[in-house]
Amino acid sequence: MSSQRRNYRFILVVTLFVLASLAVSGRLVYLQVHDHEFLADQGDLRSIRDLPIPVTRGMITDRNGEPLAVSTEVASIWCNPREMAAHLDEVPRLAGALHRPAAALLAQLQANPNKRFLYLERGLSPIEASEVMALGITGVHQIKEYKRFYPSSELTAQLIGLVNIDGRGQEGTELGFNDWLSGKDGVREVAINPRGSLVNSIKVLKTPKASQDVALSIDLRLQFIAYKALEKAVLKFGAHSGSAVLVNPKSGQILAMANFPSYNPNNRASFAPAFMRNRTLTDTFEPGSVIKPFSMSAALASGKFDENSQVSVAPGWMTIDGHTIHDVARRDVLTMTGVLINSSNIGMSKVALQIGPKPILEQLGRVGFGAPLSLGFPGENPGYLPFHEKWSNIATASMSFGYSLAVNTAELAQAYSVFANDGKLVPLSLLRDNPQNQVRQAMDPQIARRIRAMLQTVVEDPKGVVRARVPGYHVAGKSGTARKASGRGYADKSYRSLFVGMAPASDPQLVLAVMIDSPTRIGYFGGLVSAPTFSDIMAGSLRALAIPPDNLQDSPAVADRQHHG
């Protein structure tokens, strides 16, 4: 009897266990079939997720370590709309904290009901984000991000450029060196609690790659000097814009690259497309008379002319292939130095017609015109040199005094560095730590020194470009005034005013190119508009760099002449 009872109890226990197992299995099947979405949501809330490990974008500095672009930590607010679906009554409170209309926020949530990640506001300060998170609204979270800030604002805006909302370079140096600056974000695996908050970090799935800082060759002190001088000139002469490039001819490093007008990259409301491009590199133009020293160097190199060779320029005009060329002032006979002092189109044309187009074209190419500068800057326009299978006389003459070719302002600074550097062409660079290994002889050293001496006379002769002088220093340079093209011809009363020069002329340490676009008041000649701007920038830069003067005995006279004229 006792044996039967034991069997009965055993069968009962087994039966109950089987029934319980069937009940549990049935419930699981039911939940899988009928409550799959509910379980998915709950599993998601108690899930393992992958989150980015953001890398701080590299800093851009000037040559002395002054910050030009830095990233500051900010917070962005995001939500899981599926979590918030049951808490839409909280939208008015959330909208108030985000300073957004409640209706707009509600519409955003309802338009993305199935998303698990939706940005609500980006780039908030940590204090602003903490105020939002203090509301304790289910499904609302914050994430650490970085916002770009530009301490030098308008001074370097076109050079530095800017990033988009995701921190990727969009313009200027930010775009050109984006790979260096951005690094690579990592990825980490994290555990999320039922409220969707981070519980702990489990492991790193992808190690972040650190960003690199970029140290530019720019000197912020000199950039400020150039920018303020351009601002003064553009406002005084009612010009459309102004650009300047200051370089060290020995190293090729660009010390200032300025444009006016500019914009504030920290305030997107101030953005105007016309002011955002770096005009020193993107805008090309016919340079006019600042090309004459290169044509003259070809003439000296031909052996047919020297500094004292004479050419008749009377009666102040000449006709070539049916085209009439004029000089601004009537002269009878000029030396080659006199051709540069008086900026005679007739004299330069007659010289060019004697030596032919080939030596001039080759010389222009050797000093870098028509070729990219390879600065790593997006949007650079290298301009062009003319090419003809058969050169007409007017084509040769026009090229000799700066028409039928196109250059940018930075190219002018690089080309004039050849005169400053005894014929050596050192490619320009925007980086502080960028040793040059492509230096080449672009002009005979003797010819370069002779042209430099002629350009010094252009500035120091009483009939020369006196407004380009700098107290305490010998200056060598050339002005230019170029008519602006319009359709198939040239616009009336629309000019670009230029001056390119170097100092101290005895051993040039700085080369500066200045271009003022479309002056409308007082005058438009390069010697009137751009020469004094050159003087202001060069004088301030020489002082800032403590470059010793080489013309002390003439300082008071120069200062007096500049003050009165």
UniProtKB/Swiss-Prot annotation:
Pathway(s) annotated for this protein in UniProt: Cell wall biogenesis; peptidoglycan biosynthesis
Compartmental location: Cell inner membrane
Induction trigger: Produced in the stationary phase of growth.
UniProt keywords, alphabetically: Carboxypeptidase, Cell cycle, Cell division, Cell inner membrane, Cell membrane, Cell shape, Cell wall biogenesis/degradation, Hydrolase, Membrane, Peptidoglycan synthesis, Protease, Septation, Transmembrane, Transmembrane helix
Gene Ontology process terms (BP): cell wall organization; division septum assembly; FtsZ-dependent cytokinesis; peptidoglycan biosynthetic process; proteolysis; regulation of cell shape
Disruption phenotype: Inactivation causes no changes in the cell morphology or growth rate of exponentially growing cells.
EC number(s) recorded for this UniProt protein: 3.4.16.4
Active-site residues, as the UniProt record annotates them: S289 (acyl-ester intermediate)
Keyword Ribosomal protein: no
Keyword Cell cycle: yes
Any one GO cellular component localisation term in the record: plasma membrane
Chief localization: membrane
Recorded superkingdom: Bacteria
Molecular function in Gene Ontology: penicillin binding; peptidoglycan glycosyltransferase activity; serine-type D-Ala-D-Ala carboxypeptidase activity
Membrane-related topology note: Single-pass membrane protein
Gene3D superfamilies given in the database record: 1.10.150.770, 3.30.450.330, DD-peptidase/beta-lactamase superfamily, Penicillin-binding protein 2a (Domain 2)
Reaction equations catalysed: Preferential cleavage: (Ac)2-L-Lys-D-Ala-|-D-Ala. Also transpeptidation of peptidyl-alanyl moieties that are N-acyl substituents of D-alanine
Residue ranges of the TM segments: 10-30
Pfam families assigned: PBP_dimer, Transpeptidase
Function: Catalyzes cross-linking of the peptidoglycan cell wall at the division septum. Binds penicillin.
Family note: Belongs to the transpeptidase family. FtsI subfamily.
Name of the protein in question: Probable peptidoglycan D,D-transpeptidase PbpC
